[in-house]
C-alpha cells in the first residue's frame, strides 16, 4: 500500500491556534506516516532529480518518526528555524535539538531545505496556497492529470497538494523511481538517433526543432 508522510494535526486534533498544543509529537500521530487516501487533491509536484527525491523521503520519515516534531500552525516555522540552528543536519537535530512544531507545508519545505540550499529563507514558509507558484520555477514540475490525484501515477518523492487545505509526501509501494530513468534514457536515445539521421536538418532553426522535440518528450513522460 502506498504511503503519505505528512504533518497532520495537534495532539488535540485541531490546527493549534487555541494555544493549547505542546511542542513535540505528543501522540505519535501529529507528524506521521499513514496509508495513502483519495482526497480532492489539486496537483502534484515532482522534482527533476530522483536520487534527491528519494533522499527527501528518507529525511521526511526520520522527522516523522521523531517525537521532537509536532503540529501547530501558530508555530509553523519552528522546525525550519531549529534545523537551521543545526546547519540542516537532521541527525544532529534529532539528537540534540529541542521539541518544535510545524504544519503540513512547512514540514515539506523544511525537509527540502535540508537538500536544497537555494530554497532556504527566513521569511514565512510557503503555504498550500503558495506552493504551486513557489516550487514550479525551482526544479519542480506541476502535475494536474487524474493519475497524479488518485495516486496511480505518483512516484516516491512526489508532493501532493490540496490548496488551502493539506499537503503530503507520496511514497509508492513499488519502486517506480527506479523505472523512470529507463524511460528518460529511452526518450533521449530516440532524439539522439533522430539528430544523427538528420531529421532536424542543418538550417538555423535546427536548434529550435531539437528543443521542441526534447520538450515534447519531457511532457509525454510527466503527463
Question: Predicted regions span which residues?
Answer:
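N-terminal capping segments
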Residues: 1-120, 163-166, 171-173, 178-179
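Solvent-exposed, polar/charged alpha-helical surfaces in well-ordered, non-transmembrane soluble domains
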Residues: 58, 105-110, 189-193, 208, ...
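Short, basic/aromatic beta-hairpin or loop at an interaction surface
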Residues: 117-142
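Short alpha-helix capping/helix-loop boundary micro-motifs
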Residues: 140-152
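Loop/turn positions that initiate beta-strands
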Residues: 155-158
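Acidic, gly/pro-rich intrinsically disordered regions characteristic
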Residues: 178-186
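Extracytoplasmic Gram-positive cell-surface binding/anchoring modules and repeats
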Residues: 185-188, 196-207, 211
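Repeat-associated, polar segments at repeat-unit boundaries in modular proteins
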Residues: 211-223
Amino acid at each position: 500500500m502506498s504511503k503519505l508522510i505528512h504533518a497532520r494535526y495537534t495532539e488535540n486534533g485541531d490546527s493549534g491556534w487555541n494555544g493549547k498544543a505542546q511542542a513535540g509529537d505528543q501522540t505519535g500521530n501529529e507528524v506521521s506516516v499513514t496509508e495513502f487516501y483519495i482526497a480532492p487533491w489539486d496537483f502534484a509536484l515532482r522534482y527533476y532529480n530522483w536520487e534527491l527525491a528519494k533522499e527527501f523521503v528518507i529525511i521526511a520519515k526520520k522527522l516523522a518518526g521523531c517525537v521532537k516534531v509536532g503540529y501547530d500552525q501558530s508555530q509553523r516555522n519552528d522546525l525550519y528555524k531549529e534545523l537551521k540552528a543545526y546547519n540542516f543536519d537532521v541527525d544532529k537535530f534529532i539528537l540534540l535539538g529541542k521539541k518544535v512544531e510545524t504544519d503540513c507545508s512547512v514540514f515539506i519545505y523544511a525537509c527540502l531545505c535540508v537538500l536544497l540550499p537555494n530554497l532556504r529563507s527566513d521569511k514565512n514558509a510557503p503555504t498550500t496556497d503558495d506552493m504551486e507558484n513557489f516550487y514550479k520555477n525551482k526544479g519542480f514540475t506541476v502535475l494536474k492529470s487524474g493519475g497524479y490525484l488518485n495516486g496511480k501515477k505518483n512516484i516516491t518523492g512526489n508532493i501532493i497538494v490540496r490548496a488551502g487545505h493539506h499537503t503530503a509526501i507520496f511514497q509508492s509501494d513499488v519502486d517506480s523511481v527506479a523505472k523512470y530513468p529507463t524511460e528518460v534514457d529511452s526518450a533521449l536515445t530516440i532524439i539522439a538517433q533522430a539528430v544523427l539521421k538528420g531529421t532536424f536538418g542543418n538550417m538555423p532553426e535546427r536548434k529550435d526543432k531539437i528543443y521542441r522535440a526534447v520538450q515534447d518528450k519531457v511532457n509525454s513522460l510527466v503527463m
